[in-house]
Each structure stands twice: as C-alpha cells, then as structure tokens.
Amino acid sequence: MHYKLLFAAAAASLASAVSAAGVVGAAEGFAHGVTGGGSASPVYPTTTDELVSYLGDNEPRVIILDRTFDFTGTEGTETTTGCAPWGTASQCQVAINLHSWCDNYQASAPKVSVTDKAGILPITVNSNKSIVGQGTKGVIKGKGLRVVSGAKNVIIQNIAVTDINPKYVWGGDAITVDDSDLVWIDHVTTARIGRQHIVLGTSADNRVTISYSLIDGRSDYSATCNGHHYWGVYLDGSNDMVTLKGNYFYNLSGRMPKVQGNTLLHAVNNLFHNFDGHAFEIGTGGYVLAEGNVFQDVNIVVETPISGQLFSSPDANTNQQCASVFGRSCQLNAFGNSGSMSGSDTSIISKFAGKTIAAAHPPGNIAQWTMKNAGQGK
C-alpha cells in the first residue's frame, strides 16, 4: 500500500504541472539536487529563434513552452547520397552518409538519395536552465536538444520532442547529453526520431536522471523495417551515473538501453512493452542494476553475450544483499510473455555506496501505473 500512495502523489504533482509555471517535484536518484533555472522569472518564447536564444544564453532561465516550435525546414534542405543497409522496402530506414558512415561501414549497401534537414544538429542548452511544457502544448518538432560542452544543472520536464527526420538514420537525436552534470529529463515524450531518442555521449556525463518519460518507438520507418524503432537510449559516457525510473519504453527493437563506456545504471520500476528485438545491451564498462521493472511482450530482455556486468535482482534471497548499501532488499523484476533476465553479479551493489539511490517498489502495479502516468502532460 505504501508504494501505491507514493505513485499517487507523483501523479498528482505532475497533474498540477498543467497550470504551474515552473518545475514540479524533485529529481530522484543520481540527479537529485538539480535546480535548473531555479527561481528565475519564467519566460515564454514565441518563435523558434527566441527559443534557441533562451536555451543558449548564459542566464539562469525557466523557459515555459506553451506551443509547438516546428523547426522542420527552418535551416533549408540538402539532398545527398546515402545508403540503404537494411533494404529498400517502404518501412526501412535509410542512412545519411554522415561522417562518411555509409562509405566506411556500409559500402556495399544500395545507394539512395536522402534529404538533410534541421534535425541533424540539436539546439544547444546551456547551464542553469529549466525547460518546462505547459500541459500538452510544449512541443519541439523537427529538432532535438543537446546539453554538452560542460553544461550542467539542466531540467527538461513535461515536453515532447518529435518528428526528427524519422526516415533517416543519422537524421538527428531527440536529447543528447555529453560532457555535462546534473541533468534531469522528466515526463518527456519522444516520438518519430531518426536516430537515438536519448543519447549520453562518450565524455563524462556524470549525474543523470531520466524519469516518468515515454519513449514511443512507433514509426513508419525503422532499421528493422517493421515499425519498431531500433535506436532507443544509448548510455556511453566515460564516468556516468544514470537513474532510469518509472519510464514507459514502447514498441522498440533494440538499444533500450545500450549501456557501456563507464556507466553505472540503476533501472528501476520501468515498463518495457511490445519489443520486437532486444531491450538491454550491456557492453564493456556497463554496470547495470535492474529492479522492480516489468517486461511485457519483450522477445529478448538482455542481448547476449553480456560484456559488462549485470545484477538482475534474480531472487528474494540474493536480493537481500542490496540491504548493505540500499538499506532495503532489491525488488524482483516481472516478466509477461517475455524472455528472461539472468545476472547475479552482486559486486555491482557496492558501486552505489554513498550515492543517492531512487526508491524501488514491487512490480505488481508498475505496468498499469506507468502506462497511465509516464510522458508529457501526465
């Protein structure tokens, strides 16, 4: 009953975000303490140029989005020759030859003409920013966001990022974090994205929380040519601690998430639903503790072989070892019409010592609650 009350409180607090001019709640897990723009007076951009200016200046900002900012075509178009490594069927993504990717890695793939648009380079977000959507009105279309080059203390809450060259791999990412610290992505919806929905780059990205967000993999185009987006969440930083809590990952086929570099990931109380392919991909330097998650209709929960380390909260007895650091046992994961998740590397638990750890709840009501409450406007 206690966890039901906690989730009810979270839902109520975000419902108030529909009318609130500012951030609601506080980050759980590793990004705890992030303040974004703090108490700065809210600003309301009305044009794409004004939005870019507010996001990129050096002032602490609380930026309220109350409309759709459509960047599609705002930087012109460029027709180039790309490639079709997954085939030329109508549902297959084709690839832009970015940084000679087609030439270097897919030289034998059929050549195709593709159109390069504004989505290739995301909007720069500088330090001390809160980007907050009003109800379901705050949408950034055709271009993503990037928190990079030392930017820190950023909150992205209750917005949607959509329609970034969905036909084209390398067409753009929804949210990029690289060489940063204290970033909270909360109640965000991403949909119809060309490449990664969320990517943490190879520099140190430090403390990041992604919570109560919807990664919607439905698309007319995919690398697997079946309407299930492949490029979900890629965590590749050199010194990263990432909390994934309460998110809804829907209709994907891979990289959900891909974890490597030197990344400590706490994946807790997420719903993985309707995957035609794999969810977790754990490479060298990926340290994953997964608890209280629900996997429903996920063909492959963890791609093998695992090159990193995984503690999958495998059974009640083993899960008691979490108490030495977490002050509680870890929660079992739940599986419905899905593959298995096997990983009992308890050495990962000690890596959480002294860190801010998100609470975990039993998986019983996670699916129902997450479908109702994760994403923009919920």
Curated annotation (Swiss-Prot):
The protein's enzyme class: lyase
Known catalytic reactions: Eliminative cleavage of (1->4)-alpha-D-galacturonan methyl ester to give oligosaccharides with 4-deoxy-6-O-methyl-alpha-D-galact-4-enuronosyl groups at their non-reducing ends
Signal peptide positions (record): 1-20
GO CC terms in record: extracellular region
EC number per UniProt: 4.2.2.10
Localization terms from the record: Secreted
S-S bonds: C83-C102, C92-C225, C322-C330
Domain of life: Eukaryota
Residues bearing glycans: N128, N251
Functional summary from the UniProt entry: Pectinolytic enzymes consist of four classes of enzymes: pectin lyase, polygalacturonase, pectin methylesterase and rhamnogalacturonase. Among pectinolytic enzymes, pectin lyase is the most important in depolymerization of pectin, since it cleaves internal glycosidic bonds of highly methylated pectins.
Protein name per its UniProtKB record: Pectin lyase B
Species, as recorded: Aspergillus niger
